Regions:
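Conserved beta-strand hairpin/beta-sheet module of binuclear metal-dependent hydrolase folds
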Residues: 1-43, 126-143, 160
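Active-site environment of divalent metal-dependent phosphoester hydrolases
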Residues: 59-63, 84-86, 124, 146-149, ...
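Metal-dependent catalytic neighborhoods of phosphoester/phosphodiester hydrolases
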Residues: 64-73, 88-91, 222-229
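Short, basic/aromatic-enriched C-terminal tail that caps enzymatic domains
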Residues: 246-262
Length: 262
């Protein structure tokens, strides 16, 4: 059985694990080594069983903890070429670690097959479609302002989808953020709203996907209840019954979320 586990998720830091048997991959590391290490320890995950770290992009809420972690644990790092160039130029990845570009087709990383796909953000950014050794498929896509054709393709046919549900539009527009920041978040190079996420999840559940993780919720412009309720309202209007037809789970900001098997 494959598992998706969010170590922490939100605007202050993101990291998750995809595990199958003893082997696993880490996706991003946006908090310090103490926080990440404690999360891995709580899950009884040994560093020696990690096949590598997948990096989505260069923003600090996705790479803040990498440098210190990699000095102690020189794991291979995978990402888009532009992201790896940034990590290298800023000394984030020690010379003892291998770096591998994943801008082409499927890469064999340990026992996993990993395909990167571009997402629309204000720096070069990718999501990952991961095929597990037991034949399951999951896709993680965060930090995207719009669902482009490559994203639609990557999300289709998965057993589990982890998708950004960053903000509630009313909270964002009535909140304390200045206009330029609100505009950035709402733009096609910003983040995905609850409504946009819910509409896509409805398409996916109608195609047969049964497991969903709502990721990267904003602390200032969203709540877990709002994100879930938006999905449930969208599903309900189409006759889809959550918990009967599928599982939808928000990911916790500062602690490990419940395991999602797929």
């Amino acid at each position: 059985m494959a598992e998706f586990i969010s170590l922490y998720s939100g605007s202050s830091g993101n990291s998750s694990v995809v595990r199958c048997g003893e082997r696993y991959l880490i996706v991003d590391m946006g908090k310090g080594v103490r926080t990440t290490g404690a999360a891995l320890k709580a899950l009884d995950l040994n560093i020696s069983d990690c096949a590598g770290i997948l990096v989505t992009h260069e923003h600090s809420d996705h790479v803040k903890g990498l440098s210190t972690f990699l000095k102690k644990n020189p794991l291979p790092v995978y990402g888009a070429a532009a992201t790896l160039d940034f990590l290298d130029a800023n000394g984030i990845v020690p010379v003892s670690c291998e770096m591998h570009s994943v801008s082409g087709g499927e890469e064999d990383i340990g026992d996993f097959g990993v395909t990167a796909f571009p997402t629309s953000h204000d720096v070069p950014c990718v999501g990952y479609c991961i095929h597990t050794p037991d034949g399951k498929t999951m896709t993680i896509a965060t930090d995207l302002g719009v669902l482009t054709p490559p994203v639609h393709e990557a999300l289709s046919g998965c057993d589990l989808v982890a998708l950004e549900s960053n903000y509630d539009l009313h909270m964002l527009r009535s909140g304390p953020y200045p206009y330029y920041l609100r505009s950035r978040i709402e733009s096609t190079r910003g983040h995905l709203s609850n409504d946009e996420c819910a509409a896509k999840l409805l398409e996916l559940v109608q195609e047969g996907c049964k497991k969903f993780a709502l990721c990267h919720l904003s602390q200032e412009n969203n709540t877990p209840m709002l994100a879930l309720q938006t999905v449930f309202n969208t599903f309900g209007a189409a006759g889809v019954i959550p918990e009967k037809d599928c599982v939808v789970q928000t990911q916790r900001r500062n602690e490990v979320s419940p395991v999602l098997e797929f």
